[in-house]
UniProtKB/Swiss-Prot annotation:
InterPro entries reported for this sequence: Suppressor_APCD_1/2
Region feature Disordered, mapped onto this chain: 120-148
Protein name per its UniProtKB record: Suppressor APC domain-containing protein 1
Pfam families noted in UniProt: Suppressor_APC
Coiled coil region boundaries: none
PANTHER family membership: FI14130P, SUPPRESSOR APC DOMAIN-CONTAINING PROTEIN 1
Length: 148
């Protein structure tokens, strides 16, 4: 979608149109000030949308990463369960795996971000219907069993 930024984070670039209108009035004109403030707010909203699209893309990559690591952890658990008490003969560390504390830290950051957004919605009196959340895949459904 875009080039890679620092740290491998994809950069989202959207086309912008510059609009120059000669107003023929002074800066103190209420109409000119109103238009300028409107235009500035529109630009801020465009930048916010760009950041949100980039965040959504990062979340999709993050979801795939979590799913891959979850499958790998389940595979290792099945393998260890199959070894039984002979697991000491098959001790090999996985150096490429992130530490549990790091995964938990990311989970807490995501949870805090989502929780803050939900609190602000509740304070504004805006709540999402359960049907809408289910359509987006945001349900808190049961997790799969852990096999040993």
């Amino acid at each position: 979608m875009g080039s890679q930024g620092s740290g491998g984070v994809p950069l989202v670039q959207a086309p912008y149109t510059v609009l120059l209108l000669p107003l023929g009035t002074s800066r103190q004109d209420p109409g000119a000030q109103s238009f300028f403030l409107w235009l500035r707010r529109m630009q801020a909203l465009e930048r916010e949308q760009d950041a949100l699209w980039q965040g959504l893309e990062l979340l999709q990559h993050g979801q795939a990463w979590f799913e891959d690591h979850l499958r790998e952890a389940q595979r290792q658990q099945l393998h260890l369960g199959a070894l039984g008490e002979n697991f000491l003969t098959d001790l090999h560390s996985e150096p490429g795996r992130p530490p549990l504390a790091q995964i938990q830290k990311v989970n807490i950051c995501l949870q805090n971000l989502i929780h803050e957004k939900e609190l602000s919605r509740q304070q504004k009196g805006v709540t999402q219907p359960k049907e809408e959340m289910a359509q987006r895949g945001c349900t808190k459904g049961p997790r799969g069993p852990t096999r040993v």
